[in-house]
């Protein structure tokens, strides 16, 4: 331990303010397997050295405060403090640096994403010495991962429950998202499921409003999916949004869903909060319910490149807190999502072990030590012409969710579902035959449309719909 960075009670207390880097910048530190490691994108205020800025982040997100306090001498500061152990300049960006910070595991409560974030991304983001701050990535050590239940069931158990293998799952968000009565809402659910979809979904802001109370919606949706199951011989589901104003009300809605016998419920995990989400995930595992997660509010937190929290961190946090699905962007649709970045955090959601790969934005190797995986959900502005790209990008372990791309079909909801199912089956068959979906995708869809009038009509409606906008959040050069 360097004398410069070691804190000793024996040297006595000296009041005043000292530079953070004297205590919290420790480039000689060797990280431990049990440390939580963080990569912050730091933009210091003019005149603030990067070492001081990085040390300030480490201090303010762990044991430090703005002045020396005499109670520092009552504990082992070196055991508990965060340490900025490396700083890199960001190539191509003015006054931006990646500051790497190591946190001792004892700083965090076991099994609590809430506590972890309260420390790491708490007051430090309002610190005046920083112009901007973004948490790019976290390395969660196996010792901490093991304190979490994680997803209620995971990918393999979900496939076994649904008895569906060898292809992506198909979904649809019911539209319009607000204003339908419960009976009309249930009718739309039935038509989509009968047409060939695996799931339908409540939109994120469908909770319990005057036009459709939650209990009525749950009843009509359950009736719809059971009727569709009988007619198709397939297991169906509807994501019943249990998000509510209190945890108690949320659990009450999940209990009612279980009593109805439906397979899956839903939660808005960012607006609902990590404590509520973890509570619901535990209930779902104990009671055999799958849990679909919507990421409403994420872009407020993750879209700007120099400030906030990258979605790969929010995705890791969700895997720890618990969820069987989570929306991940589409790459090709209407929502933000650069391909390499998206595939990076998709792997972090699904795989058991992910190597560091800066070309995909992954700053640390992550070992999930058999924590169940999460299915990424591609949703937002997608239609049948996107099916080859979606199948190629996301692979089998995913949910492809078409809202307007189902309900906007000129012949109605059921034909819209048929069009999507035929397009998906054609893409999976072509891929399994060795065809290149990226190069032959349009041809594959045209060939399939010759045998499906529903798909042909969908192809005509959406043949010119594209979303050509540059991504805001891109990889560093």
Curated annotation (Swiss-Prot):
<dbReference type="GO" id="GO:0016984">
    <property type="term" value="F:ribulose-bisphosphate carboxylase activity"/>
</dbReference>
<comment type="subunit">
    <text>Heterohexadecamer of 8 large chains and 8 small chains; disulfide-linked. The disulfide link is formed within the large subunit homodimers.</text>
</comment>
<keyword id="KW-0488">Methylation</keyword>
<dbReference type="Pfam" id="PF02788">
    <property type="entry name" value="RuBisCO_large_N"/>
</dbReference>
<feature type="binding site">
    <location>
        <position position="177"/>
    </location>
    <ligand>
        <name>substrate</name>
    </ligand>
</feature>
<keyword id="KW-0456">Lyase</keyword>
<keyword id="KW-0460">Magnesium</keyword>
<dbReference type="InterPro" id="IPR033966">
    <property type="entry name" value="RuBisCO"/>
</dbReference>
<keyword id="KW-0479">Metal-binding</keyword>
<keyword id="KW-0560">Oxidoreductase</keyword>
<feature type="binding site">
    <location>
        <position position="173"/>
    </location>
    <ligand>
        <name>substrate</name>
    </ligand>
</feature>
<dbReference type="GO" id="GO:0009507">
    <property type="term" value="C:chloroplast"/>
</dbReference>
<keyword id="KW-0503">Monooxygenase</keyword>
<feature type="propeptide">
    <location>
        <begin position="1"/>
        <end position="2"/>
    </location>
</feature>
<dbReference type="InterPro" id="IPR020888">
    <property type="entry name" value="RuBisCO_lsuI"/>
</dbReference>
<keyword id="KW-0113">Calvin cycle</keyword>
<keyword id="KW-0602">Photosynthesis</keyword>
<feature type="site" description="Transition state stabilizer">
    <location>
        <position position="334"/>
    </location>
</feature>
<feature type="binding site">
    <location>
        <position position="204"/>
    </location>
    <ligand>
        <name>Mg(2+)</name>
    </ligand>
</feature>
<feature type="binding site">
    <location>
        <position position="327"/>
    </location>
    <ligand>
        <name>substrate</name>
    </ligand>
</feature>
<feature type="binding site" description="via carbamate group">
    <location>
        <position position="201"/>
    </location>
    <ligand>
        <name>Mg(2+)</name>
    </ligand>
</feature>
<dbReference type="GO" id="GO:0009853">
    <property type="term" value="P:photorespiration"/>
</dbReference>
<comment type="similarity">
    <text>Belongs to the RuBisCO large chain family. Type I subfamily.</text>
</comment>
<protein>
    <recommendedName>
        <fullName>Ribulose bisphosphate carboxylase large chain</fullName>
        <ecNumber>4.1.1.39</ecNumber>
    </recommendedName>
</protein>
<keyword id="KW-0601">Photorespiration</keyword>
<feature type="modified residue" description="N6,N6,N6-trimethyllysine">
    <location>
        <position position="14"/>
    </location>
</feature>
<dbReference type="Pfam" id="PF00016">
    <property type="entry name" value="RuBisCO_large"/>
</dbReference>
<keyword id="KW-1015">Disulfide bond</keyword>
<dbReference type="InterPro" id="IPR036422">
    <property type="entry name" value="RuBisCO_lsu_N_sf"/>
</dbReference>
<comment type="function">
    <text>RuBisCO catalyzes two reactions: the carboxylation of D-ribulose 1,5-bisphosphate, the primary event in carbon dioxide fixation, as well as the oxidative fragmentation of the pentose substrate in the photorespiration process. Both reactions occur simultaneously and in competition at the same active site.</text>
</comment>
<keyword id="KW-0150">Chloroplast</keyword>
<dbReference type="InterPro" id="IPR036376">
    <property type="entry name" value="RuBisCO_lsu_C_sf"/>
</dbReference>
<feature type="active site" description="Proton acceptor">
    <location>
        <position position="294"/>
    </location>
</feature>
<keyword id="KW-0007">Acetylation</keyword>
<feature type="binding site" description="in homodimeric partner">
    <location>
        <position position="123"/>
    </location>
    <ligand>
        <name>substrate</name>
    </ligand>
</feature>
<dbReference type="GO" id="GO:0019253">
    <property type="term" value="P:reductive pentose-phosphate cycle"/>
</dbReference>
<feature type="modified residue" description="N6-carboxylysine">
    <location>
        <position position="201"/>
    </location>
</feature>
<feature type="binding site">
    <location>
        <position position="203"/>
    </location>
    <ligand>
        <name>Mg(2+)</name>
    </ligand>
</feature>
<keyword id="KW-0934">Plastid</keyword>
<dbReference type="InterPro" id="IPR017443">
    <property type="entry name" value="RuBisCO_lsu_fd_N"/>
</dbReference>
<feature type="modified residue" description="N-acetylproline">
    <location>
        <position position="3"/>
    </location>
</feature>
<dbReference type="InterPro" id="IPR000685">
    <property type="entry name" value="RuBisCO_lsu_C"/>
</dbReference>
